């Protein structure tokens, strides 16, 4: 019974990180990658168990790859190392609809809108 409770606690922690950690690294390729705190590239806004069935109408990935916009979320962190040696940049600030920066590529400088260093690729 205790091991079952431990497993449930670990699952709860993992799912909380899944929703609230600042999102996916783009390896410095797109400067406007999002942090998946509020609006994600794919809808993490929905719970994982519903994801095969439920999809929100709003799909920012249609727009973002061309313009490098990053959708700000709850807690964007510093970006990881970019593919070409630049840092990814910041995730997002609070509930801002867009992270800072129109920056399709991040070569050696901060491309605002990137995220948590690829921990959650």
Curated annotation (Swiss-Prot):
Question: Highest taxon of the source?
Answer: Eukaryota
Cite the repeat ranges for sequence: 48-51, 52-55, 56-59, 60-63
Q: Which intervals of the chain are annotated as region 4 X 4 AA approximate tandem repeats of P-I-Y-R?
A: 48-63
On tissue specificity, the annotation reads: Expressed only at the mantle edge where it is found predominantly in the inner side of the outer mantle fold.
Gene Ontology MF terms in the entry: calcium ion binding
Residue numbers of Pyrrolidone carboxylic acid PTMs: 17
- What are the record keywords, sorted? Calcium, Pyrrolidone carboxylic acid, Repeat, Signal
Q: Does the keyword Iron apply?
A: no
Q: Which residues form the signal peptide?
A: 1-16
Name the Gene Ontology biological process terms.
shell calcification
Q: What does this protein do?
A: Displays inhibitory activity against calcium carbonate precipitation, binds calcium and affects crystallization of calcium carbonate in vitro. May be involved in calcification of the prismatic layer of the shell.
Q: Which named protein is this? A: Prismalin-14
State the organism named in the record: Pinctada fucata
Q: What is the lineage of its organism?
A: Eukaryota, Metazoa, Spiralia, Lophotrochozoa, Mollusca
């Amino acid at each position: 019974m205790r091991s079952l409770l431990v497993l449930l606690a670990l699952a709860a922690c993992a799912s909380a990180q899944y929703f609230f950690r600042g999102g996916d690294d783009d390896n410095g390729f797109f400067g406007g990658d999002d942090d998946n705190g509020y609006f994600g590239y794919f809808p993490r806004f929905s719970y994982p168990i519903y994801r095969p069935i439920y999809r929100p109408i709003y799909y920012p990935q249609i727009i973002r790859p061309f313009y490098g916009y990053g959708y700000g979320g709850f807690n964007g962190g510093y970006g990881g190392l970019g593919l070409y040696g630049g840092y990814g940049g910041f995730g997002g600030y609070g509930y801002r609809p867009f992270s800072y920066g129109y920056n399709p590529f991040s070569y050696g400088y901060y491309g605002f809108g990137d995220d948590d260093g690829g921990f959650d690729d």
